[in-house]
């Protein structure tokens, strides 16, 4: 069995506080709208695509791994 990692929850709001990054900072650094960022920070929009996640991680100064709470499940290994 292999591990399959799944993002369980976003840590965006927590990391913004930890790294002292405001919503206005993210608007300026990412070019995303304030409303869209508020939706992610407030948890109203939970499914962030990989590009958006990388954009936030880069703007905050953290890794993409830090941006999420992760969980894994066992999955079967493909056999030949």
Curated annotation (Swiss-Prot):
It holds the Pfam family HTH_26. Gene3D superfamilies: lambda repressor-like DNA-binding domains. Keywords: DNA-binding, Transcription, Transcription regulation. One of its GO terms (molecular function) is DNA binding. SMART domains: HTH_XRE. Residues 23-42 bind DNA. It comes from the Bacteria. Residues 12-67 form the HTH cro/C1-type domain. This is SPbeta prophage-derived uncharacterized HTH-type transcriptional regulator YotL. It comes from Bacillus subtilis (strain 168).
């Amino acid at each position: 069995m292999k591990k399959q990692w799944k993002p369980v929850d976003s840590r965006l709001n927590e990391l913004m506080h930890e790294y002292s990054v405001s919503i206005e900072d993210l608007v300026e650094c990412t070019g995303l709208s304030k409303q869209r960022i508020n939706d992610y920070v407030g948890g109203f929009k939970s499914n962030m695509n990989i590009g958006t996640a990388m954009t936030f991680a880069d703007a905050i100064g953290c890794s993409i791994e830090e941006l999420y709470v992760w969980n894994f499940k066992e999955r079967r290994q493909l056999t030949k």
